[in-house]
Design a protein with these regions (language model features):
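Structural motif
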Residues: 54-62, 106-109
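Short loop/turn segments that connect beta-strands within beta-propeller blades
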Residues: 65-67, 111-115
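Mobile, glycine-rich extracellular loop/lid and propeptide segments
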Residues: 98, 105-111, 121, 130-136, ...
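Beta-rich, blade/repeat-based domains predominating
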Residues: 81-93, 125-139
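Bacterial Sec-dependent N-terminal signal peptides
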Residues: 2-7, 14-45
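A short beta-strand motif characteristic of beta-propeller blades
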Residues: 30, 69-82, 116-125
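Conserved beta-strand positions in repeat-built beta-propeller and related beta-rich domains
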Residues: 45-55, 99-103, 143-145
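Short loop/turn segments that connect beta-strands within the blades of beta-propeller domains
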Residues: 56, 93-94, 103-104, 137-138
Length: 145
């Protein structure tokens, strides 16, 4: 009896496995993100996602009010490298974005209009500083660790 159940279970599992080989995805139209790293961003806003802890998958996306599209992981697309591990806070100062990347112990500085990386400022005071929050006042940027 148990052997028959095992055979039936094995047969069903095999059919399901084979069935997945014959599934297909529909082809998608290009989303228009190709070459977007070279154009200047205008009306819209940035969305920073912290990602999963320890996964080095923080992103900086841009939502365009003009066309209603979200341009995912724009920082990586523009710069050829990811934002880092666990982005925590972001502030706009003039034409620059200052992004606190906690797990990578740094501040990423990017151009607000193009998302191009301008600088990476390492925070290496102490054993493991882990910067968290950022503020601007009277021409200075302050970071808490």
């Amino acid at each position: 009896m148990i052997k028959n159940r095992m055979r039936i279970f094995g047969f069903i599992a095999g059919l399901l496995s084979i069935g997945t080989l014959f599934t297909a995805c529909e082809p998608t139209e290009p989303d228009g993100n190709e070459g977007e790293s070279s154009k200047e961003l205008s009306k819209g806003f940035y969305v920073m996602t912290e990602g999963l802890w320890g996964q080095n998958n923080s992103t900086l996306d841009f939502y365009s009010i003009e066309d209603g599209q979200t341009h995912l992981d724009l920082f990586a697309l523009t710069n050829g490298l990811g934002l880092g591990e666990t982005a925590n806070d972001m502030i706009e100062v003039g034409n620059k974005l200052f992004i606190v990347v906690n797990g990578s112990n740094c501040i990423m500085v990017a151009d607000k209009k193009t998302c191009k990386k301008l600088a990476m400022i390492p925070i290496n005071q102490g054993e493991n500083p882990q910067p968290r929050c950022i503020a601007y006042h009277n021409g200075s940027v302050f970071v808490s660790c």
